[in-house]
Amino acid sequence: MNAEQQYIDLFSQTEAMICQHSTEVMNTPRATAFADFERLGFPTRKQEKYKYTDVSKFFEPDYGLNLNRLDIPVNPYEVFKCDVPNMSTSLYFVVNDAFYNKALPAPHLPDGVIFGSLKEMAAKHPELVKKYYGKLADTSKDGVTAFNTAFAQDGVLLYIPKNVALERPIQLVNILRGDVNFLVNRRVLIVLEDGAQARMLVCDHAMDAVNFLATQVIEVFVGENAVFDLYELEETHTSTVRISNMYVKQEANSNVLLNGMTLHNGTSRNTTEVLLAGEGAEINFCGMAIADKNQHVDNNTSIDHAVPNCTSNELFKYVLDDQSVGAFAGLVLVRPDAQHTNSQQTNRNLCATREARMYTQPQLEIYADDVKCSHGATVGQLDENALFYMRQRGIPAREARLLLMFAFVNEVIDTIRLDALKDRLHLLVEKRFRGELNKCQGCAICK
């Protein structure tokens, strides 16, 4: 039995159970998503978008799923302690694919802000969730998005009303927890109305040393003049596979910063599609990956300049050691009416060994003539002249290598607009390069 068939059979047998433990808003598109999954199947290397990562093979093993929504015997508020100096956040948890709401802290959110379980919030605010859920994540075009939509039962909703600004960042910690190999399907819906402002930090952790497979679909709507910063920090273990699809839509004069940082993982496959739908919208999109052993990190991005006078800046950097593999494919599309577009895309990569492999594919599609667009990609090794220069001045060879690698990724870290997080990332990256880090030293949740 192939991977698709086992999940087709599973859905057919358990559809009623899946719907029973979810909500009407999430159940409504479920049948269509399942039909799309039956038609599309899991992506393979035969598809251009997935040619650097064979996603289908990760679904072949047997995984446990919590379709009955059984309680997880862990209180994350008792075992998690984020001690990043000078960083004050509103802290929340998702355990596997369920929002943890049994010991919520005292709310620090302004009036009108909605944050919590997607399932519960959809029951309380059905028209709001219905307006946005599934409107960016097109199940007819991507097998993973279709699969996630068919099986997801809960998730997270963040809604910020017009002209409301969150003073404190929201910190969402995704915890993978299981005694057997486990599959989770996470869903995130983020809506900022016109003039709203928010910052969000999402941290991925795995508590147990079993095989985890996590699919994730994130939809982000950013209204006119709204400002949103989203930081994703992945620190799981080498038996974890994460397949994440993010869809972002920006209206006029909105400003978004996306920063995805992979410090430790097994396999990460991240797709991000950004639609600049209103004039004056700006996206600053950064990513960093540090990989060693047989780790694999693949980022596939697209930025659609659909209207005039928009700006996009994209910067991705990889440092690959041992036999690790990295991939970056980035498309910038400038449509015929999108005059006065300003776009810059850069991908720089450092292979610390001859065995490490990096695939890079920057792309520009420009159908307007009054634009300023550039792209570039480099793959190289450490600068031998710089190493020689540093050793001549008494710096040991290993220390010189570490200094050069740290300087290489520092440009991405410096885009972070939370000073406390930026300072902690400098420390974590240094420890990662020294081989001293396989989990966040700023918390006590991972084994």
Residues covered by each model-derived region:
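Short, low-to-moderate order helix/coil transition modules at the start of elongated helical scaffolds
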Residues: 1-217, 227
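Conserved beta-strand/loop scaffold segments within soluble protein domains that form the structured core
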Residues: 124-388, 392-395, 409, 413-447
